[in-house]
Amino acid sequence: MRVKGIRKNYQHLWRWGTMLLGILMICSAAEQLWVTVYYGVPVWKEAATTLFCASDAKAYDTEVHNVWATHACVPTDPNPQEVVLENVTEKFNMWKNNMVEQMHEDIISLWDQSLKPCVKLTPLCVTLNCIDWGNDTSPNATNTTSSGGEKMEKGEMKNCSFNITTSIRDKVQKEHALFYKHDVVPINNSTKDNIKNDNSTRYRLISCNTSVITQACPKISFEPIPIHYCAPAGFAIIKCNDKKFNGTGPCTNVSTVQCTHGIKPVVSTQLLLNGSLAEEEVVIRSENFTDNAKTIIVQLKEPVVINCTRPSKTTRRRIHIGPGRAFYTTKQIAGDLRQAHCNINRARWNATLKQIVGKLRKQFVNKTIVFNRSSGGDPEIVMHSFNCGGEFFYCNSTQLFNSTWLSNSTWNDTEGSNNTGGNDTITLPCRIKQIINMWQEVGKAMYAPPIEGQIRCSSNITGLLLTRDGGDNQNETETFRPGGGNMRDNWRSELYKYKVVKIELLGVAPTKAKRRVVQREKRAVGIGAVFLGFLGAAGSTMGASMTLTVQARLLLSGIVQQQNNLLRAIEGQQHLLQLTVWGIKQLQARILAVERYLKDQQLLGIWGCSGKLICTTAVPWNASWSNKSLEEIWDNMTWMEWEREIDNYTSLIYTLIEESQNQQEKNEQELLGLDKWASLWNWFTITNWLWYIRIFIMIVGGLVGLRIVFTVLSIVNRVRQGYSPLSFQTRLPAPRGPDRPEGIEEEGGDRDRDRSGQLVDGLLAIIWVDLRSLCLFSYHRLRDLLLIVTRIVELLGRRGWEALKYWWNLLQYWSQELKNSAVSLFNAIAIAVAEGTDRVLKILQRAFRAILHIPTRIRQGLERALL
């Protein structure tokens, strides 16, 4: 009875255990997540890539060659697309922007390339015999008018004669040319006082001892033309639209564009010309306001117009300085001989300074703001230098930066209008230089040929470059001076709100969908989603931003469009048989875009996801990558946030997907070996029938061989027993009728089982009998073997079950014995402890009583002693 109860309880426990295991398997299968690949997700990362240019084809004169080579740029998009990214915050840093470095290198390359075919003026590095060319020698001199500008000083121009090689190398002739006095330096041994008095006559060009002077080509133009920097396919430009953005930190109003706005590459110092304006108020930007070595870039809200002019009319002539080379110099200066100058409205300038001071006071609280002139250095830094109509002006900006602003917002102009033509206009005296130290690098100089006629240009001052004096912080005055010279700050003032990002079209995320492995059926791709635009859903949650096809299509279409633009640009310059900087950048951008596209497609192909936007995999999602639930991921996170979370595990996930796909391909290859069994119709093909015939012949041959072997063995066995083999000609007894049972007269009924078979006639009959006997033999042997195995398994199962029951009963018995022993031991210990405790308590009780009886014993002793 006890054994039966144990068996029933065991079966009950087995049933419940099976149910619990099934429930656990179902729950584990329901919660299992799998990696899913998405192509076209709105995710980007900061990158430094090759940008190409776009320019308006009608923005320049086709007759002249502008130094910016914008004819090699692609045409601007008449309808540029700008997609606002909702709920997106992006970090910018204008001081560490690769776009600035790239533009700087591009402008340097353009200048170098434009001057490369031009004439080197090395033959002019000879001794010049010069005399002053003053305005008193010209009969056409006029007086200074009220429009501003001082009369040209005597000695401002030098009339120099020199010996030069003609078109015939061994022939030298004497020529003369006019140079500005700041373009030549004396080379005699006169003292400094003589040089100061300017009474020397022997000169040389200023840069002959340090630089190679290159004359700008005659038809070259330095007029700035807006250049749009564009990102290649697979990349994008992120733009910050915050109106008070200081250039660093997070920006909440973000959009994506393919090209920047038109940036005019104006090469100037101190003042930023013809740039972009602030929208709401003046903005000052600096990498660190507390570091006086850092330049402060000021962006104005409203422009200040500066009108510059060279009043005199100039003509030029050409001097041959060798075979195929010519030097252009000033032939005659006529008309108004006033000095070149620039005019600025005083009230407008003072109002601008007041706005700038208000912004500076937020950084330098309770300080007196002082604007002072440049502290010294190269002429390009000390003066406001820029290009006006092809001539390089160097203007004294002291009158612009010569004021003190007290903490109560009052100001004091230290010079006032003493040096101006009136109270309403600030006139800056300018001088013109023809030999320019190249701002790109040391050791190069350029000679700008004189421009004929009068020169007038009007520009907008849109920003300033300031530096702050260092010193004791206890000083209550902060002095700011005009700066510049590093053209990166000029480009940075326009590119501060842009950054280049690389679009990461591939994304992985967990889903409940698992790839059906070893499935060769092709399914069409369909997505019921609304396409919001390129990266337009970057701020939406992962479940709501199903804009995958937009990025995928625009990437390929962008490559094709860029290729067409490149071919059009190359076609326009094919007569030159060379590419400009922009053409090379076009090629680089094209190759880069194709490489990125092919790389993504290669990964998709390796993962078995070619042509799919959503691709499930057989890779289980590891909770160590991210333990968030599906609801937290798909309903609350954007793709950008999700990408940042799993960025450290992306390469590992990619590797696992590749390994899983490789394993699946191996499984498919093995399955193809069994694929011919998938259709029964293939069994009836002629190829299979030939195999069937071959197999049949082999089987028949094997049976015949076995028959022969068995026959020989039977004969040998019977011979050994004393029998002789019967002749094959022995006839069988005639079969009897149904009314006569076989056997002898004494015997009746059916035939007993004979030990030997019948002898038959004919090949087919023999084959049939042999085949039948072989099949029966095989069947009997297999049946016996199966019965033996079944008996053994049954016996082992019964013995095993009995052994298990025995061990279970034995375990229960010894468990009960151990339990009883433990209880007995516990009881014995408890009894022993109780007895010991009683003895201790009795001893303590007796001792206590003895102590209590001590006074009584003392009293009794005293009583006995007294008696």
From Swiss-Prot:
- In residue numbers, the region (V4) covers 395-430
This protein's GO cellular component annotations are:
host cell endosome membrane; host cell plasma membrane; membrane; viral envelope; virion membrane
Sites of S-palmitoyl cysteine lipid attachment are: 775
- What keywords are assigned to this protein? AIDS, Apoptosis, Clathrin-mediated endocytosis of virus by host, Cleavage on pair of basic residues, Coiled coil, Disulfide bond, Fusion of virus membrane with host endosomal membrane, Fusion of virus membrane with host membrane, Glycoprotein, Host cell membrane, Host endosome, Host membrane, Host-virus interaction, Lipoprotein, Membrane, Palmitate, Signal, Transmembrane, Transmembrane helix, Viral attachment to host cell, Viral envelope protein, Viral immunoevasion, Viral penetration into host cytoplasm, Virion, Virus endocytosis by host, Virus entry into host cell
Residues on Cytoplasmic side: 717-867
Q: Where are the transmembrane segments?
A: 696-716
Q: Which residues form the signal peptide?
A: 1-31
Can you list the disulfide-bonded cysteine pairs?
A: 53-73, 118-217, 125-208, 130-160, 230-259, 240-251, 308-342, 388-457, 395-430, 609-615
- Renumbered residue ranges of the record's region V3: 308-341
Where is the motif (YXXL motif)? 723-726
In residue numbers, the region (V5) covers 473-483, 475-483
| GO BP terms | clathrin-dependent endocytosis of virus by host cell; fusion of virus membrane with host endosome membrane; fusion of virus membrane with host plasma membrane; positive regulation of plasma membrane raft polarization; positive regulation of receptor clustering; viral protein processing; virion attachment to host cell
Chain segments carrying region MPER: 673-694
Cleavage, annotated site positions: 523-524
Region described as V2: spans on this chain: 160-208
> Annotated region Immunosuppression: where?
585-603
Annotated spans, V1: 130-159
Q: Which residues lie on this side of the membrane: Extracellular?
A: 32-695
Region of interest (Fusion peptide), residue spans: 524-544
Q: PTM per UniProt?
A: Highly glycosylated by host. The high number of glycan on the protein is reffered to as 'glycan shield' because it contributes to hide protein sequence from adaptive immune system. Palmitoylation of the transmembrane protein and of Env polyprotein (prior to its proteolytic cleavage) is essential for their association with host cell membrane lipid rafts. Palmitoylation is therefore required for envelope trafficking to classical lipid rafts, but not for viral replication.
Q: What else is known?
A: Inhibitors targeting HIV-1 viral envelope proteins are used as antiretroviral drugs. Attachment of virions to the cell surface via non-specific interactions and CD4 binding can be blocked by inhibitors that include cyanovirin-N, cyclotriazadisulfonamide analogs, PRO 2000, TNX 355 and PRO 542. In addition, BMS 806 can block CD4-induced conformational changes. Env interactions with the coreceptor molecules can be targeted by CCR5 antagonists including SCH-D, maraviroc (UK 427857) and aplaviroc (GW 873140), and the CXCR4 antagonist AMD 070.
The domain-related comment in the record is: Some of the most genetically diverse regions of the viral genome are present in Env. They are called variable regions 1 through 5 (V1 through V5). Coreceptor usage of gp120 is determined mainly by the primary structure of the third variable region (V3) in the outer domain of gp120. The sequence of V3 determines which coreceptor, CCR5 and/or CXCR4 (corresponding to R5/macrophage, X4/T cell and R5X4/T cell and macrophage tropism), is used to trigger the fusion potential of the Env complex, and hence which cells the virus can infect. Binding to CCR5 involves a region adjacent in addition to V3.
Q: Which family does it belong to?
A: Belongs to the HIV-1 env protein family.
Tell me what this protein is called: Envelope glycoprotein gp160
Upper classification of the source organism reads: Viruses, Riboviria, Pararnavirae, Artverviricota, Revtraviricetes
- UniProt gene name: env
